[in-house]
Design a protein with these regions (language model features):
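A short, surface-exposed beta-strand/turn
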Residues: 42-59
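Hydrophobic aliphatic residue packing
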Residues: 6, 10, 35-37, 48
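Conserved histidines in hydrophobic membrane contexts and catalytic metal-binding motifs
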Residues: 28-38, 42, 50
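Acidic-residue sensor for enzyme active/binding pockets
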Residues: 24, 34, 57
């Protein structure tokens, strides 16, 4: 999964939000991505799985 794919996922699943940063995290379950997204003054972190699903969100 590359940044372009993550940006497309965020655009589809979280309209109005933009990707600010992407960090790849590898653990025993395989690669996942911590994705910082922004909308105005709001900022959140999404956890995205390698199979292109948002599996968690932190405010």
């Amino acid at each position: 999964m590359v940044r372009d794919e993550i940006e497309a996922l965020v655009a589809r699943e979280r309209p109005g939000w933009r990707v600010a940063d992407v960090v790849e995290v590898n653990d025993e379950s395989g690669p996942t991505f911590e994705v910082a997204v922004e909308r105005g003054d709001e900022r959140r972190t999404l956890l995205v799985s390698a199979d292109e699903r948002i599996v968690g969100e932190r405010r």
